[in-house]
A protein has these predicted regions:
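RNA pseudouridine synthases
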Residues: 2-12, 24-263
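Cationic, amphipathic, low-complexity segments that mediate targeting or membrane/lipid association
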Residues: 17-20
């Protein structure tokens, strides 16, 4: 077993809040520059889901059920899995940097952006703050929207205890644009562009419109999806590379479970 590897997920440990970088949780193996060994099957799977990678950033195709960054569940996040992958692939000694400028909810799939250097992370965070990173989402719903395209403007509040957001008069403004782009015998596919970034914004606003996302029991769907996720895909991301200053334009494939949807 190499010095950059540990036996299994069971070797994970959490540092205390005071020891974690920037006040966030971090894993003991990561801080020590020691990473678990990925099986050949997991290694190939991770490799095949990298949509773009260079020395500064990595764009990954997330599946439903995966978490992007560590949370209270203690499940291994993609940020740590990717560190282990890079350490194993490149024979990289010491720590691997994998910054997280944005996240996707556990039940959501699609494009996730990671920074491979602190410089890239700082610049990507600034670009996100300025609205210079453009993302579009695809959502499947069983109900046809009132209009084929529209801009939704609502006020939203977040209930921390329920981990759920609601439309309410005393909330913060939430705006998005949706467009109906495909239909199947049972479902309608909406393309969504966010103008604000509220908690569960797409899920909440589409539900409030009468179009809960397929599989999203929390926001009014009638039944769950077999994989436990919801039919919301981070479909596309486009921005100017923070270091190279070239255009980055990446599209995630349509999940195989989305039968009848053309990608």
């Amino acid at each position: 077993m190499g010095k950059n590897q540990v036996k299994s997920r069971g070797d994970w440990g959490l540092l205390g809040q005071g020891e974690a970088h920037s006040g966030e949780k971090c894993y003991l193996c990561s801080v020590m520059g020691v990473y678990r060994s990925l099986s050949p099957e997991e290694f190939r799977d991770i490799q095949q889901r990298i949509l773009l990678e260079d020395n500064h950033l990595l764009i990954f195709n997330k599946r439903t059920g995966e978490i992007v960054q560590g949370d209270k569940t203690g499940d291994e996040p993609l940020s740590e899995t990717l560190k282990a992958f890079i350490a194993q692939r490149d024979g990289k000694p010491g720590q691997v940097f994998m910054g997280v400028p944005h996240r996707l909810d556990r039940p959501v799939s699609g494009v996730v952006l990671f920074a491979k250097t602190s410089k890239a992370l700082e610049r990507l965070n600034e670009m996100l703050r300025k609205g210079e990173i453009h993302k579009t989402y695809w959502a499947l719903t069983a109900n046809r929207p009132p209009k084929d395209t529209d801009i939704l403007t609502d006020n939203m509040v977040r209930n921390e205890a329920q981990n759920k957001s609601y439309v309410a008069q005393n909330g913060k403004e939430a705006r998005l644009k949706y467009t109906l782009i495909q239909t199947t015998e049972r479902y309608f596919l909406l393309e969504v562009e966010l103008y604000t970034g509220r908690h569960h914004q797409i899920r909440c606003q589409l539900s409030h419109m009468g179009c809960p996302i397929k599989g999203d029991l929390k926001y009014g769907a009638k039944r769950s999806n077999p994989d436990g996720g919801i039919s919301l895909l981070a479909r596309h991301i486009q921005f100017i590379h923070p270091v190279k200053k070239t255009e980055v334009d990446v599209t995630a494939p349509v999940p195989v479970s989305w039968k009848g949807i053309e990608g």
